[in-house]
Curated annotation (Swiss-Prot):
Function comment: Plasma membrane t-SNARE that mediates docking of transport vesicles. Necessary for the translocation of SLC2A4 from intracellular vesicles to the plasma membrane. In neurons, recruited at neurite tips to membrane domains rich in the phospholipid 1-oleoyl-2-palmitoyl-PC (OPPC) which promotes neurite tip surface expression of the dopamine transporter SLC6A3/DAT by facilitating fusion of SLC6A3-containing transport vesicles with the plasma membrane.
Upper classification of the organism: Eukaryota, Metazoa, Chordata, Craniata, Vertebrata
Residue numbers spanned by region Interaction with CENPF: 154-298
Location(s) in or outside the cell: Cell membrane; Cell projection, Neuron projection; Cell projection, Stereocilium
Protein's recorded name: Syntaxin-4
Keywords linked to the UniProt accession: Cell membrane, Cell projection, Coiled coil, Hearing, Membrane, Neurotransmitter transport, Phosphoprotein, Transmembrane, Transmembrane helix, Transport
Location, primary (coarse class): membrane
Example of a GO MF term: SNARE binding
Gene this protein is translated from: Stx4
Extracellular side: 296-298
GO cellular component: basolateral plasma membrane; cell surface; cytoplasm; dendritic spine; endosome; extracellular space; glutamatergic synapse; lamellipodium
Length: 298
């Protein structure tokens, strides 16, 4: 997709910041509906948000389960299978979000023909914001799993040292991990060392877990790669829009306070007018009485 951010920055005679604020304000829930096509668009956006909320929940659950397994020397097969099932759910939700984002992405022809349209710019902004959130979430998941992998490798390294297999260097360990087969990995360890059965089982289990992790990380990376470049290019624009939205919200809040103060001042002014009118009326009445008495006495 061709990046036309520079054209948006040029704009026309209207301030870019004001335009972007008006466009971006429809990103949030409660935005005004502009017609049936937009109702359908916002329904799709709501579906994406719901799917991403599920994805975020699964990522949090994955983090908790990884901590539990790391704390268990020999995790049961059911625990490892549960973790793998969770990874599969995350990948499936990631694919769903990717397809949903693709469905709301403005087509190039539409974007070119109606680029100055508020609706088109709103859709591009909405798509960019959601894409950025998705990429950040997947990046978080990948970083979390990479950290989990390193902790598993460290567990293997400690086991090798405990069992007097400390002669295995970090480079050799990585080469054995890259073998892709637990049997080869284990046989390489057994060549020159005496390893207890329990330690061997844990090392083998950790190696299998690392293999699954690496596959999961690769697959997740493939899911969001197509969005990463576009999000990076539009990141500056999105950040500027967010800043303008916050500034506008602050401006609206201050404006509401000013209106409230003005209304209170208006009420006070009305009361003062009434009091002045009463005072004037009483004064006139007193003068009339005095004049009347003077005339009568005279």
């Amino acid at each position: 997709m061709r990046d036309r951010t520079h054209e948006l920055r040029q704009g026309d005679n209207i301030s870019d910041d004001e335009d972007e604020v008006r466009v971006a304000l429809v990103v949030h829930s409660g935005a005004a509906r502009l017609g049936s096509p937009d109702d359908e668009f916002f329904q799709k956006v709501q579906t994406i948000r719901q799917t991403m909320a599920k994805l975020e929940s699964k990522v949090r659950e994955l983090e908790k389960q990884q901590v539990t397994i790391l704390a268990t020397p020999l995790p049961e097969e059911s625990m490892k299978q549960g973790l793998q099932n969770l990874r599969e759910e995350i990948k499936q939700l990631g694919r769903e979000v990717r397809a949903q984002l693709k469905a709301i992405e403005p087509q190039k022809e539409e974007a070119d023909e109606n680029y100055n349209s508020v609706n088109t710019r709103m859709k591009k902004t909405q798509h960019g914001v959601l894409s950025q959130q998705f990429v950040e979430l997947i990046n978080k998941c990948n970083s979390m799993q990479s950290e989990y992998r390193e902790k598993n490798v460290e567990r293997i390294r400690r086991q090798l040292k405990i069992t007097n297999a400390g002669m295995v260097s970090d480079e050799e360990l990585e080469q054995m991990l890259d073998s892709g087969q637990s049997e080869v990995f284990v046989s390489n360890i057994l060549k020159d060392t005496q390893v207890t059965r329990q330690a061997l089982n844990e090392i083998s289990a950790r190696h299998s877990e690392i293999q699954q992790l690496e596959r999961s990380i690769r697959e997740l990376h493939e899911i969001f790669t197509f969005l990463a470049t576009e999000v990076e290019m539009q990141g500056e624009m999105i950040n500027r829009i967010e800043k303008n939205i916050l500034s506008s919200a602050d401006y609206v809040e201050r404006g509401q306070e000013h209106v409230k103060i003005a209304l209170e001042n208006q009420k006070k002014a009305r009361k003062k007018k009434v009091m002045i009118a009463i005072c004037v009326s009483v004064t006139v009445l007193i003068l009339a009485v005095i004049i009347g008495i003077t005339i009568t006495v005279g």
